[in-house]
């Protein structure tokens, strides 16, 4: 038995989404038979392009994407360029590994009510919810779509900044979610998990020094 709505929208309170954007995202999902989740390009409050998708990386690439130095050194290897992502059925949108949780649409016809209830993991908060969702959909043979000819506005970090004022506190929360994701979704063994923990400890020290001592922000 399926839910009555054809689509469900999940969004943060700090986003601005037009009716035209919503209709365009729904259209992309409708045209993609195995498309389960979709969103649009993200822009900030100044209209500048912002982060709009992730690849579902291996654990080691994911770790490199965490370090402030390694992220810059290996930038070219850490994310597939938008134009190289597979095209969706509408000929415009792209298929991605994961979408930001600030705004996305779910096509309920892809799921039973039971599947839909289990779609979101309650053991993580603020970080890695999106990649966990991406992994679950991948296991189900379903796709996430990024509509590249529509956009919405997101005032990034407004919600989280109210609860976590120190960058190092946000980083700790990120690392906790990362390790949960590695263990339960990437199925890391004890030895690999220990290496990941050691790497993240170095990253946290780096963040504390750069933000606490040098007062840097990014």
Which role fits each region the language model picked out?
Residues 5, 33-35, 142:
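Short, high-confidence coil segments that cap the C-terminus of an alpha-helix
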Residues 134-216:
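Active-site-adjacent helix/loop segment of glycosyltransferases
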Residues 18-56:
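Conserved donor NDP-sugar-binding/catalytic core segment of glycosyltransferases
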Residues 12-16:
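The conserved acidic donor/metal-binding loop of glycosyltransferases
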